[in-house]
Amino acid sequence: MQAPAARRMSRWLRHLVWIVPLVIFDIWFFGHRRGGGCEPPVSVEEPAAILEQEVAPETHPPWARLVYPTDQQGILQPGVPGVYQPTASGNPDSAMYGSVRTGSRGGRLVPTFHEGLDIAALRRDAQGRPLDEVRAVADGVVAHVNRFGGNSNYGVYVVLRHDDPIGRVFTLYAHLLSLAPGIQPGVVVKPGAVLGRMGNTSSSPIPMARGHLHFEIGLILNGQFGTWFRAKKLKPDHGACHGWNLLGLNPLDFLRFQKEKPEASFLDFMATVPSAFDILLAVRRKPDFFDRYPALWSGEQPGGAIVVACSENGVPLRGRAATAAERGQLGKLKSRIIRVHEDVLGRNGSRLLTRRAGVWVLAVAGEQWREMLLYPSLP
């Protein structure tokens, strides 16, 4: 006959047989339902497929019927109060594109780069929430949708792909409160199609009173970015539509250009964008970027090095093979800054470049940019 203590232990062990599996299931099930501290699921395959579809050579620019992304009609007048939403600083310039903001780094204040326009709300409800609809600016295809506000600094955001003679141009609509029904990758949209409602979603807090639309337009740096990103074991994974891979040009400059030349292509606009720096890069092959935007490449195939003219935030504006003399200047280096146009570089908020011993070189952010541009054929 078992002692009382032994009987109690026996009953406890029998209970463990069904308690342990239930506990394990509970942890797994509710962890997946609630996110469990993991990143919410995002679509990473569909955007890549949509962005890599071929653009027909006879494609016409999609901008002739361009509309503004909200009901705000004063977008070309940044000096008018209420058109753009500044940061907490109250500085109107902080809503614009460029090195217009100041942040803290290592205990000191440094310029930071803002890659789009922050368009203010025209209408709000009784609680102060924006009521403005956010709309597609031109004919396009939904390339990516992030439905989880905490999964990106962009919050809830939509990326559209637009077919232009230059190739695939993107527009991005960020900090949305909600998405319109049916907005998902692969959906074709027309100018003015409602994408969602303006909001203040983000992985970093934005007060409701400063809810706005963050709008970008630009090019995709590398079609294989998602593979590079996952190899680094980084999160969150938005595939090719991660913000690092979407390099925006000045939307206000583009909108002004398009108003003057509504039939022009994005390539025509890019011809007006000045270079901030020209860089000599060691390569194994021509970068994916110039395969997807061949009109930005001139001349023969590279023979081990290329020269790229870049905007302040690293948009490759033009590329060509390096000359023999330029290859000689590179030596065993992986990169060399040929020239810097300091009037264009300005406050250098992207910090792709830095001075060392009076010489311009790639900074840490610049080395990452080089790696993303050249992947998967890094020298």
Task: Outline where the language-model segments fall.
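Hydrophobic alpha-helical membrane-insertion segments, chiefly the h-region
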Residues: L22-H32
